[in-house]
UniProtKB/Swiss-Prot annotation:
The keyword Transmembrane helix does not apply. The lineage of its organism: Viruses, Duplodnaviria, Heunggongvirae, Peploviricota, Herviviricetes. ATP binds at L90, G91, R92, G93, A94, F95, G96, I97, I98, K108. This is Viral protein kinase. It comes from Human herpesvirus 8 type P (isolate GK18). It is found in: Host nucleus. It catalyses: L-seryl-[protein] + ATP = O-phospho-L-seryl-[protein] + ADP + H(+); L-threonyl-[protein] + ATP = O-phospho-L-threonyl-[protein] + ADP + H(+). Keywords: ATP-binding, Host nucleus, Kinase, Nucleotide-binding, Transferase. The gene is vPK.
């Protein structure tokens, strides 16, 4: 009778009471019963907090100094997605392959279990933060997963139309593209300020489009691929440990990053290429290239914003239809006698230096990256052989561009919004130690 009287009364807390008694004689909360409650019965000041408690996101089981021990949700261990079409392949990389499931879904299959957990955790942290700040416009520009699947070692994502390199740039509208890249700027800012993360791999391959960037079918641009994300030094945790349900360690992640692994070389910030160049020279900087370092929030914003800016420069080259041949053919060899070749890293400065020179002439403004086409750098006296080689390669790169396309640059680039956008994206970067002096961050 006692239990029946209690069951007729509404519970005093949003959790169900179990019939077990504690050591003091009082009733305890049954965790199994609590997990079965629907969302509406939970009382919380923030929807994000209730979502976290409902075990839909990863949970922090314990902490130790700056290390967080994480436990994956039970839902991740259940394979409920459809079988992918293995006969078709949408993409491939060092992680594995991407294959379609349907017209709206695709699956990213990982070769490594460690890499799978890394991207799943980073994506889940981003989505949890996005639920906490639903009004921030940048959150909607980050592509979240649909479902991770531990048994299949794969992550289900929404299927987009294409990436930026696959767009038909002859039909793209500059005003639409500028508006979409402004949204991507908000995404990078959201990731840095609210998520405490640095993407570290912003490039045309990792920016997906849902439309054609035309007035009739503008679509949206979203940033994807969180497999290279790093937590910056402003976040609460610097190390993450994935544990099993029994508490055993499975994978440990340290978010210090060496300069050579920050972004693809073609979109790597100039300040990072500067460190790679110094490291390839040897002497006191010989160990910089492979040495992992923590990334400060300011430097993290410089990395992602600058990479987004160089992605935009690549898109403008495609829009103007400038290059006759592949720009990468002007790069030198990566190594010589087992050591990194200095001109190899300087070669990745060539496309951006030439393009900023063109834009500076068209828009009558100064876009200074700290290195010009003559090979003169403001931060360091360049070796004469490197300066002459860089000057020669810049000349060849200009000769590789179509003359008729260069003649029409002024008419095709008549977009004030785009001019302001390029300046904002590149204002933090400089070919020196740490970026532009007024936005410098400590990373090395």
């Amino acid at each position: 009778m006692r239990w029946k009287r209690m069951e007729r009364r509404p519970p005093l807390t949003p959790l169900r009471r179990s019939r077990t008694q504690s050591s003091g004689g009082g009733l305890t909360i049954c965790p199994r019963c609590a997990l079965k409650l629907p969302k509406a019965t939970r009382i919380s000041e923030r929807p994000w907090a209730s979502t976290w408690q409902l075990n839909q996101h990863i949970q922090v089981s314990k902490t130790k100094k700056a290390t967080a021990y994480l436990k994956a949700p039970r839902e991740w261990g259940q394979c409920t997605h459809q079988d992918p079409d293995w006969s078709k392949r949408l993409g491939r990389g060092a992680f594995g392959i991407i294959v379609p499931i349907s017209e709206d879904l695709c699956v990213k299959q990982f070769d490594s279990r460690r890499e799978f957990f890394y991207e799943a955790i980073a994506n889940d942290l981003m989505q949890a933060t996005r639920e906490r700040y639903p009004m921030h416009s940048g959150g909607s520009r980050l592509l979240g997963f649909v479902q991770p699947c531990i048994p299949c070692r794969s992550i289900v994502y929404p299927r987009m139309k294409c990436n930026l390199l696959q767009l038909d740039w002859s039909q793209v509208n500059l005003s639409v593209m500028a508006a979409e890249f402004t949204g991507l700027m908000a995404a990078v800012s959201f990731l840095n300020r609210y998520c405490g993360m640095v993407h570290c791999d912003v490039s045309p391959d990792n920016i997906l489009a849902t439309g054609d960037l035309t007035p009739m079918n503008p679509g949206r641009l979203v940033l994807t691929d969180f497999g290279s994300v790093a937590l910056h030094s402003g976040s609460k945790w610097t190390n993450l440990v994935v544990t099993s349900n029994l508490g055993f360690k499975q994978h440990c992640y340290d978010f210090r990053v060496p300069p050579k692994l920050i972004c693809k070389h073609l979109y790597k910030p100039s300040c990072v290429l500067f460190q790679c160049y110094l490291s390839s020279l040897g002497k006191m900087h010989a160990q910089v290239l492979d040495q992992p370092y923590p990334i400060s929030p300011n430097m993290g914003l410089t990395i992602d914003m600058s990479s987004l800016g160089y992605t935009l420069l690549t898109c403008l080259e495609l829009y103007l239809d400038l290059p006759l041949n592949n720009p990468l053919k002007f790069l030198g060899s990566a190594t010589r006698d087992g050591r990194p070749e200095p001109m190899y890293y300087l070669g990745f400065m060539i496309p951006r230096v030439v393009m900023t020179q063109i834009l500076s002439a068209v828009w009558t403004m100064t876009l200074d990256l700290g290195l010009d086409c003559t090979g003169k750098a403001q931060a360091i006296p360049m070796r004469q052989e490197h300066q002459l080689a860089f000057q020669k390669q810049c000349y060849l790169y200009k000769a590789n561009q179509k003359a008729e396309s260069l003649a029409n640059c002024s008419d095709k680039l008549n977009c004030p919004m785009l001019k302001s956008l390029v300046r904002k994206l590149l204002e933090r970067d400089f070919f020196n130690h740490g970026g532009h002096p007024h936005t410098r961050g400590l990373v090395f």
